[in-house]
């Protein structure tokens, strides 16, 4: 199985999920065939799986625009990155307050073709 360079890619920015949670789900489908990955993500019950599946479907649509055969595609890379972080205040007893971080993420999916 020889692998060529990256054929197509798709991405999504500022998604309301932490990079840590997305990375757990991305590990399930990294370096897998596209057909296997879509089934895995469809039956995974985590919210992050739905977010990654949308980006993967976008990358598959980009591959179809180039006339590539979907059966020969695999996920070469899934990059999960940090995006912006909103800081919020959570009031505590005796006039104190804690800071709460609302984290956002970026996803990039790169597909390669199996020759």
From Swiss-Prot:
One of its GO terms (biological process) is translation. InterPro entries: Ribosomal_uL22, Ribosomal_uL22_bac/chlpt-type, Ribosomal_uL22_bac/org-type, Ribosomal_uL22_sf. It comes from the Bacteria. Coiled coil: none annotated. The gene is rplV. GO terms for cellular component: cytosolic large ribosomal subunit. This protein binds specifically to 23S rRNA; its binding is stimulated by other ribosomal proteins, e.g. L4, L17, and L20. It is important during the early stages of 50S assembly. It makes multiple contacts with different domains of the 23S rRNA in the assembled 50S subunit and ribosome. PANTHER family: CHLOROPLAST 50S RIBOSOMAL PROTEIN L22-RELATED, LARGE RIBOSOMAL SUBUNIT PROTEIN UL22M. Belongs to the universal ribosomal protein uL22 family. Pfam families: Ribosomal_L22 (PF00237). The keyword Transcription regulation does not apply. HAMAP family: Ribosomal_uL22_B. Part of the 50S ribosomal subunit. This is Large ribosomal subunit protein uL22. Keywords: Ribonucleoprotein, Ribosomal protein, RNA-binding, rRNA-binding. GO terms for molecular function: rRNA binding; structural constituent of ribosome.
